[in-house]
Amino acid sequence: MSNERYNARESEPKWQAKWDEAKIFATRNDDPRPKYYVLEMFPYPSGRIHMGHVRNYTMGDVVARTMRARGHNVLHPMGWDAFGLPAENAAIERKVAPKAWTYANIAAMKKQLQTMGLSLDWAREFATCDPTYYKHQQKMFLDFLKAGLAERETRKLNWDPVDMTVLANEQVIDGRGWRSGAVVEQREMNQWVFKITRYAQELLDALETLDRWPDKVRLMQRNWIGRSEGLLVRFALDSATTPAGETELKIFTTRPDTLFGAKFMAIAADHPLAQAAAAKDPKIAAFVEDCKKRGTAQAEIDTAEKLGIDTGIRALHPFDPNWQIPVYVANFVLMEYGTGAIFGCPAHDQRDLDFVNKYQLGNTPVVCPEGQDPSSFVITDEAYDGDGRLINSRFLDGMSIAEAKEDVAKRLETATLGNAPVGERKVNFRLRDWGISRQRYWGCPIPVIHCEVCGVVPVPDKDLPVVLPEDVSFDKPGNALDHHPTWKHTACPQCGAKATRETDTMDTFVDSSWYFARFTDPWNENAPTTPDVVNRMLPVDQYIGGVEHAILHLLYSRFFTRAMKATGHVGLDEPFRGMFTQGMVVHETYRKADGMFASPAEVAIVAEGDGRRATLLDDGTPIEIGPIEKMSKSKRNTVDPDDIIGSYGADTARWFMLSDSPPDRDVIWSEEGVKGASRFVQRLWRMINDAAEIAKAAPAARPDAFGPEALAVRKAAHGALDKVLSGIERLAFNVSLAHIREFSNSLGEALARPGAASPDVAPDLAWAIREGAVILVQLFHPMMPHLAEECWAALGQPGLVSEALWPQIERDLLLEDSITLPVQVNGKKRGEVTVARDANNPEIEAAVLALDAVRQALDGKPVRKVIVVPQRIVNVVG
């Protein structure tokens, strides 16, 4: 065996320079080969890449390199999702301009990514904060505006009075701003929205076509869109208890079958009826104000205590005008969902049951499980939401749920209240239009001008881009664009009067909703896309990113692609053909006696009995080994990719990230695992060098025949080719790596055989070893490209392995020498027989009739005939 060590520090920069010089990863848009577009979600330039980036981008690179070797014109670009609040926070905390901070981070992270050896087309690189990028985003905004897909509307929004900005629902925690801690106010504000709801049904239906997306992601989007079929019911209000002018209360329900179980109505705090009641009762007014201070995120509403206050208003049951139902203002009803009002049937909804138990409103079960005695069926603390038959429901009694729903719908459709039907079948969606206005500086400016004469005026195309000013100050809270002395002041493009620019900027999700399309031709200065190019290169064949983006980013991108199609920028509906969500990189946590966390670099781990013990490196103080958690700065359980690449090399880091666990699951970072990957790198290097020596004795031409030893090597090599490729195509990278290890063991055994390293080695074996070594290098090239290039050169192969085509698999070599066939006697399986693959019928018959199971089944009866279905089955007829 060769004793020369592989030196990653020397090898990796050398090959990266050669790739760059040869421009082998640059993609030509006019390349006639079939295209393959692989894309990992582009990063936010925070300043440092982390191990999650290493895993994510390594996966994409394996796919890109493999598809390139398979003869495709691969597009594998990289850019930067560069707008966002962290840059403004840095400006406030570090007194550095957002632009300078962002571009410095981009430079640092690009350098880090380049050390990984990724096969990226850096010529297509852009940042979303480049005016040359957001110019086209502004153009599309104006196109959407013309098409009615962008509108300005008044919405109730979460307003942080200290930071002076709108907060998303998820940023309101216990009624306070996540950053300032200030009590959040509900304000009606003008907001720019994209009309995603126009595509709600289409976005839902098209999920069925995305068969290369994870089921969990499709389910999350399906639930977020939230289609529900139900009935819009108009409840008359009792005039004696209702404020003047209010006559009815509309609710949308998916369970009209449970109307006879209604015990209360609940309305949102900002429902007009609640406002009318609050105007007359200080207690109701105080409760309404308290509701407005609470978070409106669904997760917070689901977990908060369900509270309400009786308005004194009474609604009349649609089937019984003498049945009055109390109307409550409740903290779990939101105005933006449905009609902002519900009816509560506590026996069959847990939230409603918790509510009535708190306020002692009682419950009446109206659906009884099959087989249960209706007279004894009661509900106490647990609602029943299963199937059954209707009870306590007058004319609905005995019906199934489906029958009762239909009966109620028909009756209420024909009943009237005023001049309109009491009931109307409706389809409702949970999805709401996408509010894109943000009161921030570091975002894409919204290209409209506000004129007192003309109103809202689009910025003319010739004046795009509307560029952010750089001389901004963050000394005051709120949006720096509002405080700028000159930027927002302009002239109206239509009448020339004094006017002001829109100072809201776009949600950063807009920036990432079309970047994949821009990558197809980022040099086009005149339009967001080049139609013939974008329609040829899209959709993205394989998109890779975290499951945390399953809803917003992926759903917004699906909408945006449709909006781009409607405005002539693309010719397709779905942006991503295949979607893969990788697991996280996790690590143990280490906690010191004072409760503070220690980083892995500060800790020594030693085995102790059946367990392990951790101490601080600097003074030997024992510390607690905590749970394995996602790498995070707060837990200090991060590992710096630069340290790993500097110590072991990029290929070792890449290999470890792929080898230890299925790619859709979390990978546990361990120093021992990395060391094991490093040892494997060295083993491969020695093995290929030994094979290169033997290959010198190989004939140039393929031998006419191969002996058993050579044939075994060739079978192992071509079997690995087939299995490794299959694993990569299924994104089962850990499976592919296991097959590479398996084949390396087979090749290692061949190299270790007596005589293999001899000058007199058999020509057929030398040829097979050379072929096997070349195949092995091509197999691990997508995962460890630097080592592969070094090994490729050691084997004397021409050019770069990064440009080599995938070897042709010889299918004959995948066939086993023997085959196992099921054996039936008179049509009933009795056993199996293993015979040579090329055995003839008489040989198969003899082997079958010699089986004890066959003789026992025949029980002395003569054999009438033996039917052999080649390569399939044998049937004995007795």
UniProtKB/Swiss-Prot annotation:
Q: Which InterPro entries match?
A: aa-tRNA-synth_I_CS, aa-tRNA-synth_Ia, Leu-tRNA-ligase, Leu_tRNA-synth_edit, M/V/L/I-tRNA-synth_anticd-bd, Methionyl/Leucyl_tRNA_Synth, Rossmann-like_a/b/a_fold, tRNAsynth_Ia_anticodon-bd
Alphabetically sorted, this entry's keywords are: Aminoacyl-tRNA synthetase, ATP-binding, Cytoplasm, Ligase, Nucleotide-binding, Protein biosynthesis
Please provide, in alphabetical order, the Gene Ontology terms of the cellular component aspect for this entry.
cytosol
Q: What EC number(s) are associated with this protein in UniProt?
A: 6.1.1.4
**Motif 'KMSKS' region per UniProt: ranges:** 630-634
Which Pfam family name is an example for this entry? Answer: tRNA-synt_1_2
Which superkingdom? Bacteria
Residues engaged in binding ATP: 633
Gene3D superfamilies from the xrefs?
Answer: 2.20.28.290, 3.10.20.590, HUPs, Isoleucyl-tRNA Synthetase, Domain 1
What GO molecular-function term can you cite, just one?
Answer: aminoacyl-tRNA deacylase activity
Q: Which subcellular locations apply to this protein?
A: Cytoplasm
For this entry, the protein name equals Leucine--tRNA ligase
What's the source species for this entry? Rhodopseudomonas palustris (strain BisB5)
Top-down, what is the taxonomic lineage of the species of origin? Bacteria, Pseudomonadati, Pseudomonadota, Alphaproteobacteria, Hyphomicrobiales
Q: Which gene encodes it?
A: leuS
